[in-house]
Amino acid sequence: MSRPRRELPQPLKRLLKLRLLLKRKKPEFVRIDQWRYKRIEDSGWRNTRSIDNKIRRKWKGWPKPVEVGYRKPAAVRGLHPSGFVEVLVHNVEELAKLDPKTHAIRIGRTVGLRKRIEIVKRAREMGFYVLNPGKRVEEALKKELNTAQTGQ
């Protein structure tokens, strides 16, 4: 199934493109000495504290520190790249509260296959963009469609 596109106003389209450009320019923020010690390799950013710290003092050749200027435009912050607002769904009833023109759904990871198939079916009937239908769900829906066509 083709991906639905949200009809975005021109300023929002421009801001989504700008967000993509800013994302490409943003450096990877690393904790001090993460390249030196395996135990802190994947621990993420921690603010620097010492008076002699090169990152805090923004020395040339050292990793960039986290700063306000790397933030994305407020209007598109938290939006999916397609322009939809991403919403986590765990059952079919939650779809009734959402608008297919502005929301895209992501099915919760604890939802089993049977309920996931029901959610995807109902969401597509209502016109929602499902971000993570899953390969097994797609296969089950195709099989169901084929049996319905051959049965007629």
Swiss-Prot record:
It holds the Pfam family Ribosomal_L32e. InterPro entries: Ribosomal_eL32 (IPR001515), Ribosomal_eL32_arc (IPR023654), Ribosomal_eL32_sf (IPR036351). The keyword Iron does not apply. The keyword Ribonucleoprotein applies. HAMAP family: Ribosomal_eL32. Belongs to the eukaryotic ribosomal protein eL32 family. This is Large ribosomal subunit protein eL32.
